[in-house]
């Protein structure tokens, strides 16, 4: 049954992927190539020159590139050119000229042009700047409006280079903002903004390093904000490397597409596609300590190669999937918010590892296809199994999912140290499931929903075969696991609870032997709680009671901000909840504190020791 569902889902996903692969990359490449050919044909009238007499054209003025231009008034400002360093300086010029195809045209393919900006400069014409190897720098800014062609372009089939280290704003009404048959680099705190019909940046490979902001919007059908394609013979890989920069990308097709791989380190990337994918690569996707907000019609973020993300935040929203990786997926200490309408919010074809972090995954199951919130499927090449889908959750990961079905995999699901809450409508976990060696269940509750959930026997949790009475039948399931202590370790009431400590391990050790030993867990935690809580204080049964007890014991301090939780009506509890979240002793989801939320005793110990660490 599961295999049939997965087969249908895989077929639908493959169809969507084929649509994307057959349209977004090739179709855009075709449209871009056609555009470049169209532009090239129009430009031939001015670019077929004697190579020995290279020219620099600025508006309707033509200059020999071997001759200096002493400071000269032009367009309300001044220009100058140093023939030895090939440096053109614009100082406050405003040039509007439609007599040529390019406002600035540097036709020397073998010589780089250094463009230095001073003051505010404006160029308006059929096309903006054409130069095969161009570096833009200086303390000034440049605004380009191109009515027919690109804002900035190279010529030829390869070897082009563009480096931008100053503020540039481009409007390309009927072309790409930037089209370079080679490498593009944006650096030095530059701000680059563009609104264009076709691609925002179309190049072979891309580096954005320490840019203040790169804001690109493509308005044309079937176009990308960033399109990194590599060269035709494969000598230059189509890779994008983003470091410590802010990107805001909007387009019809994938807002951020790089053929052979994407690497993002630091900064923030916001990518939105109206009919395809927010961020996509056919290669590997590597993200470190960055904030990602990706949304698309098919899915928010995806790759054909493996995806690995360490640190940072990931928001991924799509019609079919939030995160869709056709390979292995590893998330290390990432704060994830993934949502989809139809299928799986977080999906991989191959091993998936969720190590630490906070993960929220919501599948609305609009497809009616018994969708999971998180699922690791097998990866095939025809009938050949390339990689088994397995799911591992560990590293004290906090996972909250909702959907028709909760979490699972085609292979083995393994749970290490984790806090997993599943609010599904059908089945919470797909078999087979195991607890990772060295870990045990600390708390287990389940039922048809959260309100009716009851304490369950941990011995009933692990199963390795289909069983209608297995614990996964509970649509709601909340499991908390932790490490096991050594045989000689015992709880220390003065030490309090720490999931990684001997005391925490000891609590875990007595919590795993069925109902009788579960009673041992109850005794152990009560002993610890009565030793650390104020004398005569009742053990809190929910989050609201715990927040009030912590706040009252701390002396009822005023929170820094006004209480703003929508689900807390009592004024004192509202202040307590606000103060506890501000101090980091308790967490909350958005504007909801969930004051009635069940709190296990070991969690009370953990929060108490955060609020009042032992001196």
What are these regions (language model features)?
Residues 193, 364, 400, 550-553, ...:
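Short alpha-helical scaffold segments that flank and stabilize functional sites
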């Amino acid at each position: 049954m599961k295999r049939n569902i997965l087969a249908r889902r895989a077929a639908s996903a493959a169809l969507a992927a084929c649509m994307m692969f057959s349209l977004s990359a090739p179709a855009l490449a075709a449209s871009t190539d056609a555009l470049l050919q169209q532009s090239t044909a129009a430009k031939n009238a001015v670019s077929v020159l004697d190579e020995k007499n290279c020219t620099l054209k600025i508006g309707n003025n033509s200059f020999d590139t071997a001759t200096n231009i002493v400071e000269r008034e032009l367009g309300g400002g001044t220009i100058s050119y140093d023939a030895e360093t090939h440096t053109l300086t614009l100082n406050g010029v405003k040039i509007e000229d439609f007599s040529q195809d390019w406002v600035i045209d540097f036709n020397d393919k073998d010589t780089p042009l250094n463009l230095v900006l001073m003051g505010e400069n404006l160029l308006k014409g059929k096309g903006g700047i054409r130069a095969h190897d161009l570096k833009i720098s200086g303390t000034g800014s440049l605004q380009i409006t191109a009515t027919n062609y690109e804002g900035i372009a190279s010529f030829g089939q390869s070897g082009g280079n563009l480096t931008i280290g100053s503020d540039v704003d481009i409007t390309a009404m009927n072309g790409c903002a930037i089209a370079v048959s080679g490498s593009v680099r944006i650096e030095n705190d530059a701000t680059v903004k563009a609104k264009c019909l076709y691609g925002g940046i179309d190049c072979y490979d891309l580096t954005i390093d320490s840019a203040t902001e790169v804001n690109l919007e493509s308005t044309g059908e079937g176009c990308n904000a960033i399109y990194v394609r590599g060269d035709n013979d494969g000598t230059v890989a189509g890779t994008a490397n983003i470091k410590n920069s802010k990107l805001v990308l909007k387009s019809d097709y994938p807002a951020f597409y790089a053929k052979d791989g994407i690497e993002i380190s630091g900064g923030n990337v916001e990518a939105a596609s109206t009919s395809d994918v927010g961020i996509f690569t056919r290669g590997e996707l590597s993200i470190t300590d960055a904030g990602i907000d990706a949304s698309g019609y098919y899915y928010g973020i995806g790759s054909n190669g493996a995806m690995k993300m360490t640190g940072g935040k990931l928001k991924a929203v799509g019609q079919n999937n939030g995160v869709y990786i056709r390979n292995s997926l590893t998330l290390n200490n990432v704060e994830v918010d993934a949502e989809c309408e139809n299928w799986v919010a977080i999906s991989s074809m191959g091993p998936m590892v969720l190590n630490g972090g906070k993960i929220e995954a919501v599948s609305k199951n609009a497809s009616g296809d018994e969708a999971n919130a998180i699922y690791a499927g097998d990866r095939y090449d025809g009938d050949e199994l390339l990689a088994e889908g397995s799911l591992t959750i560990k590293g004290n990961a906090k996972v909250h999912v909702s959907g028709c079905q909760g979490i699972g995999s085609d292979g083995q699901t393994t749970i290490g140290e984790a806090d997993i809450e599943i609010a599904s409508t059908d089945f919470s976990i797909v078999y087979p499931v195991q607890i990772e060696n060295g870990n045990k269940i600390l708390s287990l509750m389940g039922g048809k929903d959260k309100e009716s959930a009851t304490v369950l026997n941990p011995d009933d949790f692990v199963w390795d075969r289909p069983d209608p009475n297995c614990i996964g039948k509970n649509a709601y399931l909340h499991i908390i696991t932790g490490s096991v202590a050594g045989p000689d370790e015992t709880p220390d009431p003065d030490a309090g609870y720490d999931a990684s400590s001997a005391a925490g391990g000891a609590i875990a050790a007595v919590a795993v032997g069925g109902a009788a030993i579960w009673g041992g867990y109850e005794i152990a935690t009560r002993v610890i709680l009565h030793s650390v809580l104020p004398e005569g204080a009742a053990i809190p049964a929910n989050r609201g009671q715990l927040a009030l007890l912590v706040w009252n014991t701390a002396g009822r301090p005023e929170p820094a901000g006004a209480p703003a939780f929508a689900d807390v009506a009592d004024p004192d509890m509202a202040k307590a909840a606000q103060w506890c979240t501000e101090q980091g002793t308790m967490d909350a989801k958005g504007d909801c504190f969930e004051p009635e939320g069940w709190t296990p005793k070991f969690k009370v110990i953990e929060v108490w020791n955060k609020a009042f660490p032992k001196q």
